[in-house]
């Protein structure tokens, strides 16, 4: 593939799937600056991965795989996972969708940020409607393990919501 062809494919992929990059950067970056850096790192890795895409899965699945692997590697390399979580309200400028200002969406993103790396990845994939099979392929887990983890995530989020509603938060 020539550089021109790679750039064309990359441009089409980014235009069609940039929301994935934003979501992953938002979920794994702890500050606005981190999220911007991570977004750029993910975009760079997507560009590098264009030649490796064989069409064995959907482009969306491929981009998610690249984005999540890049975020996990970046997080470990930068040591961001050891730092305290910061408030996500300062990051709304990163997302351009009007739904980003929905308090329910903000609540779910805050709770997702508190999850460990694998569960955070599963929660993002679940919100985007991926099947257990697709999630297992992206993350290298068995489908049954994905199902168990998703059920635990849902139960934990439901319990947290019930607690906050009970406490009047």
Give the predicted meaning of each segment:
Residues 1-23, 36, 47, 59:
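A short, charge-rich alpha-helical start-of-domain segment used by transcription regulators
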Residues 8, 77, 81-83, 89-113:
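Acidic, proline/glycine-rich intrinsically disordered inter-domain spacer in sigma factors
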Residues 52-54, 65-86, 101:
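Arg/Lys-rich amphipathic alpha helix in sigma70-family domain 2
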């Amino acid at each position: 593939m020539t550089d021109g062809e790679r750039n064309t494919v990359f441009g089409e992929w980014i235009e069609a799937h940039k929301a994935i990059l934003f979501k992953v950067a938002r979920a794994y970056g702890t500050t606005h600056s981190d999220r911007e850096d991570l977004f750029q790192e993910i975009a760079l890795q997507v560009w590098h991965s264009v030649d490796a895409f064989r069409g064995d899965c959907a482009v969306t699945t491929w981009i998610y795989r690249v984005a999540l692997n890049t975020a996990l590697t970046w997080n470990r390399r930068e040591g961001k996972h050891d730092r305290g979580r910061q408030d996500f309200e300062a990051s709304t400028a990163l997302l351009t969708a009007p739904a980003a200002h929905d308090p329910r969406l903000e609540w779910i993103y805050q709770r997702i940020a508190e999850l460990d790396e694998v569960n955070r990845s599963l929660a993002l994939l679940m919100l985007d409607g991926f099947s257990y099979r697709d999630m297992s392929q992206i993350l290298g887990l068995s489908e049954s393990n994905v199902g168990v983890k998703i059920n635990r995530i849902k139960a934990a989020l439901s319990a947290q919501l019930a607690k906050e509603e009970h406490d009047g938060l």
